[in-house]
Amino acid sequence: QNPIEFNKIKNIYNAKLVRYLFDTEKYQSEEDYREIFFQEYLDGKIDKNEYYNAENSFKEFIKYLSRISNVYVCYDFLASIENSYPFQNSSDVNFSLDFIKETQGKFTKIIDKFQLEQVSILFAREIVCGFIVLDDIKSVVICSGMHGCILSVNDLDSELLSAISLQVKVEKISALQN
């Protein structure tokens, strides 16, 4: 996780919350770490399969969470969708413009698979930034592309951690660090 993002999360949110970092990039050491961005795929800097494997892992991660909890989202566009290069180059996705424009900036319950798929891709491709609330497990997923932080009232149980670690690298932050 980017240290600046981590410190921002640390300073904004309640210190009593349990924190987990997640990332679709499953690297062995910090030297091996390389973030995967849709923009890099569009620019030809990463392989199509590498990008889509990471995006599919992220979507499966969100889909799994939606099976164990109600899902609410709140997001804002990083740039207007008319000017968003990643959005304009997402012709492989059948977005409902009415849905994504209506829900932008609003706390919205996701009620079907189509909405969940769209929201997952908006986050994965860094078209939006925001958070996903999982009320049944009292947790919030803060996304920055296909990585971010899970803030939880309680420790996530080992079965849940095991299931989501099949899709993303997940690591508990044991103590607040500078």
Residue ranges of model-derived segments:
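Structured alpha/beta or helical-core interaction and ligand-binding surfaces enriched in interleaved
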Residues: 1-149, 154-178
